[in-house]
A protein has these predicted regions:
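Short, conserved beta-strand element in jelly-roll/cupin
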Residues: 51-68, 84
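Short, structured helix-loop boundary elements
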Residues: 123, 147, 151, 169, ...
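Short acidic-glycine-tyrosine-enriched beta hairpin
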Residues: 72-86
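Regular secondary-structure segments
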Residues: 62, 151-162, 211, 215-218, ...
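A hydrophobic/aromatic-rich effector-binding and dimerization subdomain
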Residues: 2-39, 90-159, 189-190
């Protein structure tokens, strides 16, 4: 079901502004019926940080090829692949500055799939999202029949949105249940314990003081020992724990956060680049330029020019 009339949005503008210091992405759902389908494309050099969310996500690779980062794993994905992301897993879609990538992303809260049936049955439907172990195969590749079926059902859901009538909501739930069944059947041999979800939440709670420190003090020098102290851990334990939980070192996460702030500020032509570098915690404009280019793929000046055109 290829369709040239989808409303494609830039991945960066659609994703990055909704990510806070903890890397939590807030999605603009219709709260009365929290499910949405978006059509996204890569638009030049951009940095999208590792992020996590409480909702569930299914990505269809519409065109191009890239890597999906899930924590510290880089998973190749190409046109026709599916990507399945559960709650509270740090992840992002990576792409080269000049690569043409289009994705179709369906995000939904689990209550959409719950309709009064026995709790055990509902959990089976959602189990591919709720029990993703560290080696879980998030990318479904070389299964074109499955990918085609899921993509076509996602498009059907999109056509029913916004689902403001009973008939439309019944249609969306029916199509979603069909998708969930297809994924459950595919992942039957990979489903682990549901206790994994609670374990992940506990790990993230232990890191909350570090994220709070980052949000409040990113304009100032922050050392690993400062974040470790905030979390009541030794520096060595904190570094290992942070990397295991988030997928990046604390220093890399802090740098990405600062550069993400800089990207936003560069869209305002009134603020000098030298001032922006200081506002996001860099003492040297030249070093800021080096780091920005390494992470974003272009210089701050060129990024500003492209953003304002």
């Amino acid at each position: 079901m290829r369709n040239s009339h989808f409303a494609w949005k830039g991945i960066y503008r659609f994703t990055e502004p909704g990510i806070n210091a903890e890397g939590i992405r807030v999605y603009p759902f219709d709260n009365s019926f929290p499910i949405d389908v978006s059509f996204q494309k890569a638009l030049g050099p951009r940095l999208v940080r590792l992020n996590r969310h409480e909702f569930f996500e299914i990505i269809y690779m519409y065109s191009g090829k890239t890597n999906i980062q899930v924590r510290d794993r880089l998973l190749p994905a190409k046109a026709g692949d599916l990507v399945v992301i559960g709650p509270n897993l740090y992840h992002r879609v990576l792409h080269k500055p000049n690569a043409a990538v289009k994705i179709v992303s369906m995000n939904f809260q689990p209550e959409i799939a719950r309709s009064g049936r026995a709790a055990e049955e509902e959990e089976y439907y959602l189990s591919p999202f709720l029990s993703q172990k560290s080696d879980f195969p998030h990318v479904i590749s070389n299964s074109r029949k499955l990918s085609k079926e899921v993509f076509e059902l996602i498009v059907r859901i999109h056509r029913e949105l916004p689902a403001r009538t009973l008939v439309k909501r019944m249609a969306v739930r029916t199509y979603l249940k069909m998708i969930l069944f297809l994924l459950f059947r595919h992942y039957a041999d990979h489903i682990g314990s549901f206790d994994l979800l609670d374990d992940e939440r506990k790990k993230l709670q232990r890191l909350e003081p570090a994220f709070k420190l980052l949000e409040q003090s990113f304009t100032q020098p922050i050392e690993v020992r400062d974040a470790a102290h905030a979390c009541a851990m030794s520096s060595s334990h904190f570094m290992k724990f942070f990397k295991l939980t988030v997928g990046q070192t604390f220093r890399a996460y802090l740098t990405s956060f600062r550069i993400a702030k800089a990207q936003h500020l560069l869209m305002n032509n009134e603020i000098p680049i030298a001032e922006i570098s200081q506002q996001v915690g860099f003492c040297s404009q030249s070093y800021f330029g080096e780091v920005f280019r390494a992470l974003v793929g272009t210089t701050p000046r060129t990024y500003r020019q492209r953003s304002l055109t």
